[in-house]
Amino acid sequence: MSQGRSRGKAKGVEEFRPYVTRALPVGARVTCADNSGAKVLEIIMVQKAKTRVSRLPAAAVGDYVNVVVKKGPAELRKQVHGAVIIRQKYPVRRLNGVRVAFEDNAAVLTTPEGEMKGTDIKGPVAAEASEKWPRLANLASMVV
């Protein structure tokens, strides 16, 4: 019979992740910061979002979301894609007390495994997103 133990990690020990305010609700439009061809994305679903009844799920930096391309080439429009949020306007408080806010809300198109559909990221990437998605950090020109 099973002992109820988890494999790999010690029981009760989990990786610490600081809280990031969720500032991008479902329906928010964000700019696409990669070279896939898409210009504007609309968030239609936040993966693994736990929320209250009747409250819109919202995303923060580093979250994986389902999006629809609103402006871009015809082959990308009218279908659901995955994306990772890399910047948000609302300030993110770091553990050292610094608050970081960006000029725009931005995301990059990705697969569920974390592989980017484009080959380049325009602008900076938040450190919270690069820690959670290491493949994005490899392509980022600047991590803030």
UniProtKB/Swiss-Prot annotation:
Disulfide bonds: none annotated. GO terms for biological process: translation. Keywords: Ribonucleoprotein, Ribosomal protein, RNA-binding, rRNA-binding. It holds the Pfam family Ribosomal_L14. Coiled coil: none annotated. It comes from the Archaea. GO terms for cellular component: cytosolic large ribosomal subunit. One of its GO terms (molecular function) is structural constituent of ribosome. The keyword Endoplasmic reticulum does not apply. The keyword 4Fe-4S does not apply. Gene3D superfamilies: Ribosomal protein L14. Part of the 50S ribosomal subunit. Forms a cluster with proteins L3 and L24e, part of which may contact the 16S rRNA in 2 intersubunit bridges. HAMAP family: Ribosomal_uL14. Binds to 23S rRNA. Forms part of two intersubunit bridges in the 70S ribosome. Belongs to the universal ribosomal protein uL14 family. PANTHER family: 50S/60S RIBOSOMAL PROTEIN L14/L23, LARGE RIBOSOMAL SUBUNIT PROTEIN UL14. This is Large ribosomal subunit protein uL14. It comes from Cenarchaeum symbiosum (strain A). The lineage of its organism: Archaea, Nitrososphaerota, Candidatus Cenarchaeales, Candidatus Cenarchaeaceae, Candidatus Cenarchaeum.
